[in-house]
Design a protein with these regions (language model features):
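Short helix/loop segment flanking the catalytic signature motif in cyclic-nucleotide metabolism enzymes
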Residues: 1-33, 37-39
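Short acidic/His/Gly/Ser-rich catalytic and metal-binding motifs that mark active-site loops
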Residues: 1-2, 51-56
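A general secondary-structure junction signal
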Residues: 3, 43-49, 94-96
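Charged, alpha-helix-enriched surfaces in structured cytosolic catalytic cores
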Residues: 15, 40, 66-73, 91
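Conserved, well-folded catalytic cores of nucleic-acid-processing
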Residues: 23, 27, 78-81, 85
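A short glycine-enriched loop-to-beta-strand structural element that forms part of the catalytic core
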Residues: 34-53
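Catalytic-core segments of nucleotide cyclases and related cyclic-nucleotide turnover enzymes
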Residues: 35, 54-80
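Intrinsically disordered, glycine/charged-rich C-terminal tails and inter-domain linkers
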Residues: 84-149
């Protein structure tokens, strides 16, 4: 759960999704090496105006933030689509996509990032995009055997 008051923050959150996706590839590589079953996860991202409320009990140290709004439920719904029915792990709503894609294109001018995403129509929870984006340097390190110098 991240608060994104600025458009640049939405890009940074998407970037974290790309790292999580790459991390899961590393973790599953380790599992395969030890003949363990792989883990499939869905990574959901949604952006919307939310209400954040602090809830707890006075004097007992319980003081948590609670997010109220569509972004949380949609992110959960999108995560449920990830790595299922032929979808890749990363699933993000159109608002998230629209607020980060220009920066992704700017940071990858020769790589056509818009082609990394597939658009899906969903009347229920809202349209979304799917992708299997990884951090290349991190992935190369995984493929090279995860050696620490």
């Amino acid at each position: 759960m991240y608060t994104n008051p600025k458009q640049a923050d939405v890009y940074e959150t998407a970037n974290k999704c790309f790292y999580v996706n790459t991390f899961m590839k590393m973790l599953n590589q380790l599992f395969r090496e030890h003949n363990l079953p792989e883990i499939k996860v869905g990574i959901g991202m949604s952006t919307a105006q939310e209400l954040v409320v602090k809830a707890g009990r006075k004097g007992v140290g319980i003081n948590s933030k609670i997010w109220i709004g569509k972004a949380v439920s949609r992110a959960c719904h999108y995560a449920d689509h990830g790595n299922k029915d032929g979808n890749p792990a990363i699933v993000m709503g159109t608002c998230s996509y629209n607020n980060m894609i220009d920066k992704l294109v700017k940071n990858n001018p020769d790589r056509k990032p818009k082609e990394w995403f597939t658009y899906h129509k969903d009347e229920g929870e809202g349209d979304y995009y799917t992708a299997d984006i990884i951090k290349i340097d991190f992935d190369n390190w995984i493929k090279a055997g995860m050696k620490i110098d």
